[in-house]
Amino acid sequence: MSTLKQLLEIVDLLDDPKVDGEQVREFFTNKGLSHMEINVERIEGEKASTDFISIMIQGVEGKYSGGTSRSLGIIGRLGGIGARPECIGLVSDADGAVVSLAAAYKIAEMMRRGDFVGGDVIVKTHICPNAPTRPYKPAPMMDSPVDIFTLLKREAEGQIDAILSVDATKANWVIKHNGFAITPTVKEGWILKVSPDLIDIYIRVTGQPPVVVPITMQDIIPYTTPVYHINSMMQPWIYTKAPVVGVAITTSMVVPGSATGATNIFHLEQATRFVVEVAKDFGRGKVKFYDEEEWGKIISTHGSLADLMRRGAPK
């Protein structure tokens, strides 16, 4: 299986100063993908606006149609796909939107051809080609066009049993790998062990040993606490009880989110294939994001950390 065609088309679609959510909707509508429902919502912020996109792909045994198969959420986390007029072209920070939309495109095409996923797949991201930046060297840092918690609430809502949160994770000295990496599972304020099932998928997709982002407690507390966060990849856990795993697009050298010319198709193709493989297996009950028995022991002995770790985030 390859997702290269889908990626190339999505990158071409998004690398446009005039692109918006309606153009993304029109792109998919013109493909005749009947298993896909798309909603677009314009969100206005103090600094800019963005088009929030929600895509529902109905599984053959999914909850949307009355079934019982588990639903997977795929979030494309980012500040913006572009930073115009400061920077011209698609920026590194666009990776989350690119991968999530390419995965939706691939899964919907699979369904049309007769390769059906069991559970529903809900894809959420947003489109802003002119997101604001903050001063930073060697290139301006991406900023969110609207309040981040407004986006996070929308990303995490719905009947979702697990979430993959895809984000460019290149402007740090912690995870130094060309390709993509996954995180330990985060659930209700706890950082749990890395899912063995997701490790297996990572290995079969890349043919390489698994690469794991060493997230810390600081990375999962709300952005209202003014301390270092590797990025916002893990923030969706704040508004859901579903387990969240980050899919980080990574590089061996620091690449700012506002850098142009940084869209590495080969890295993104592997990450997209990983996301699609997880979607296929999760809905069929072949993948677990966490061990339910171990989780029960953790909660019965130590209790929930959700309220403690969510402090400062708006409800």
Which stretches of residues belong to each language-model region?
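Short acidic, glycine/serine/threonine-rich loops at helix termini
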Residues: 86, 132-139, 174-178, 259-260
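A structural-propensity feature for long, helix-poor, extended segments
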Residues: 118-151
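Acidic, glycine-rich active-site loops and adjacent beta-strand->loop/helix elements
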Residues: 78-81, 125-132, 170
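Alpha-helical metal-binding/catalytic segments enriched in His/Glu/Asp
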Residues: 74, 83-125
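C-terminal domain-closing interface element
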Residues: 29, 138-187
